[in-house]
């Protein structure tokens, strides 16, 4: 027997079936009415119906079958791709235990170096601050222990001593007998004679020097 594919039944058939007591099944959710609604009867009823209708049965249309298969294929492919991507990402994200240990060791080394450098810097800064405090304390102690500049109560101005000048008046001969004393005359007369002799000799020498050029010109 040849089975003929019948298109979807019209709406009035559904109403008739509902009146007869047959309830059509709702379409599957998410398929957007891509399947044809078929009334579900018992096996005997179906056989009788097939006999009455001359071997005709309600089957899904080719377009609805094609759309349903495509949707199933797409859903399966999407599900498989999601699983493969999640597995790949989990494999990539989870490092091996050796690499994890190396990373942890490197991080600990970097953190220990950072802490050591920070501790050294803090020690140096603390030493500088202590030295500055010591210097400030020394300056304060020096300033407080210095003697106060208290001026004396009485001022006495003293003139500097003059150097003794050489003069005949302050000589011993003048003090004893005056100008006409023997000691004064012994000193004064020879000095006077020597001064005159020197003046006379200097005059004669100058006169001779002046007379010689005039005679040579003639």
From Swiss-Prot:
Membrane topology designation: Single-pass membrane protein
Phosphoserine modification, residue list: 61, 116-117, 119, 165
Transmembrane spans: 187-207
GO MF term set: identical protein binding; lamin binding; protein homodimerization activity
One GO term of the biological process aspect: cellular response to hypoxia
UniProt PTM: Undergoes progressive proteolysis to an 11 kDa C-terminal fragment, which is blocked by the proteasome inhibitor lactacystin.
Biased composition (Low complexity): 41-50, 81-96
InterPro entries cross-referenced by the UniProt entry: BNIP3 (IPR010548)
Family the entry assigns: Belongs to the NIP3 family.
Protein name as catalogued: BCL2/adenovirus E1B 19 kDa protein-interacting protein 3-like
Organism: Mus musculus
């Amino acid at each position: 027997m040849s089975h003929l594919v019948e298109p979807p039944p019209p709406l009035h058939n559904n109403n008739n079936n509902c009146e007869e007591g047959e309830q059509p099944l709702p379409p599957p959710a998410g398929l957007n009415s891509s399947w044809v609604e078929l009334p579900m009867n018992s096996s005997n009823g179906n056989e009788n119906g097939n006999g009455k209708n001359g071997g005709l049965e309600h089957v899904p249309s080719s377009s609805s079958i094609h759309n349903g298969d495509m949707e199933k294929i797409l859903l399966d492919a999407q599900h498989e791709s999601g699983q493969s991507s999640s597995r790949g990402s989990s494999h990539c994200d989870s490092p091996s235990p050796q690499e994890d240990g190396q990373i942890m060791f490197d991080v600990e080394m970097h953190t220990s170096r950072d802490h050591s450098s920070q501790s050294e810097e803090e020690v140096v800064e603390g030493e500088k601050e202590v030295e500055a405090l010591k210097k400030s304390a020394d300056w304060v102690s020096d300033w407080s222990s210095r003697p106060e500049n208290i001026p004396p109560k009485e001022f006495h101005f003293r003139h500097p001593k003059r150097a003794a000048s050489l003069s005949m008046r302050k000589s011993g001969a003048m003090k004893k007998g005056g100008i006409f004393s023997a000691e004064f005359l012994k000193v004064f007369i020879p000095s006077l004679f020597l001064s005159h002799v020197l003046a006379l000799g200097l005059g004669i020498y100058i006169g001779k020097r002046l007379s010689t050029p005039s005679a040579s010109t003639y």
